Amino acid sequence: NTEWKSGLLIEEKLHSELFNYATSNTTFEELYYHMNEFIKKCGYLNLDFNGNLGHSIVKNKNHRIYIENGNKKKLGNVKYFTFEPHISLPNSDYGYKKENIYYFNNDKLIEL
């Protein structure tokens, strides 16, 4: 299915864009706006019910912070974070989600 394959490729493209855009000084909010705009430019919708794209990795899930509007914390201020865009084409039967964990080492983004 061409549409299905295209969705999987867009997920890869989104994770590549994370490497192109994110620095340890990028805020969770800046990443939220950049990646949501990138998703739209690719012709897709963000399906997450809260609109976020991932979160910090912490022992207590109640202490998570999210890649969302209003979060001014810098990516480099957390030990690990997920990037997990949940996307779809408008009016499609398919949705896509790829989740990876990332961290910074000397300002270089690393995929766990």
Place the predicted regions along the sequence by residue.
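Active-site neighborhoods and metal-handling regions in enzymes and metal-associated proteins
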Residues: 1-112
